[in-house]
Amino acid sequence: MAGGEQSGRCSRARFLTRLSVGILASAATAVPASGAEPAAGTASSRPWKGRTISKVKRWDVITIGNLSRNRYWGENDAKGVRSAICTCTVVQGEGFRLIVDPSLANAEEMSKELDRRTGLQPRDITAAFITHEHGDHWFGLAHFSEARWLAAPDVAAALNKTNKLPKSVESATDRLFDDLEIIPTPGHTLSHHSMRFDCEGMSVVLAGDSVPTRDFWRERRGYYNCVDFELSAKTMDRIASLADVVVPGHDNYFLNPLK
């Protein structure tokens, strides 16, 4: 790999080592670098939910998102103070390279971040999946013109009605590429869908805005524009039952349960 720093790879030993020394919260590196096996009594003793056999070989966070306003930082729900960017992830496996929620509207920036985190170019991406219809989760979709564009049926219909995309988004249900599960996660929007997969024995959920950030997750609270707060809390409980790793819509990934 070009450059002196390894891309973030879903190696369980490396992942757990960084957790054990408290580096997970760092926004500088989205996925583990390298290190020794974790010591006894660390996160390695957790019972993992994922399967060790999976077509998914690696996953990389491309952009770590942020909210336009964050009540847990003392900001008012009624007023945005910055532009929102969503967390974007690439999942690679046997026969596919999938990007989830491409977030950057600027083509040069999107290409640069993709290369910086994976060494890939937009033309290398074979498919894109969008969790829901809010624009900050698909503003970068058009940069992946050679990929298949996919979303749950109601999300695909909403995206196609915008008339802002150069081609149609296809409906996808249940599963992609055998081992990527599309799971309904309503609350933020009623049609919201997340993605779950196994990688090296860990179950990973790309939550989208069903989990805005780790603070919202901890409080089981939806974002200010959530359409159903009670349903959102139930959805987070469901994700908790499925995931070892949660990738939220506007934050770095974290381990479940969150300590």
Residue ranges and their predicted role:
Residues 8-28, 32-95, 234, 238-245, ...:
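Zn-dependent metallo-beta-lactamase
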Residues 54-59, 92-97, 174-181, 199-203:
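Beta-strand-turn-beta hairpins that frame and shape the catalytic cleft
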Residues 76-78, 115, 219-225:
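Short glycine-enriched, charge-decorated loop/helix-capping segments at active-site entrances
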Residues 79, 83-84, 97, 102-175:
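Active-site HxH/HxHxD metal-binding segment of metal-dependent hydrolases
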Residues 83, 106-109, 187, 227-235:
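Soluble or luminal CAZymes and related metallo-dependent hydrolases
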Residues 100-103, 126-134, 150-152, 184-187, ...:
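Active-site neighborhood of phospho(di)ester-bond hydrolases with catalytic His/Asp-centered motifs
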Residues 169-191:
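A mid-sequence, solvent-exposed acidic-amphipathic segment
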Residues 192-259:
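Metallo-beta-lactamase
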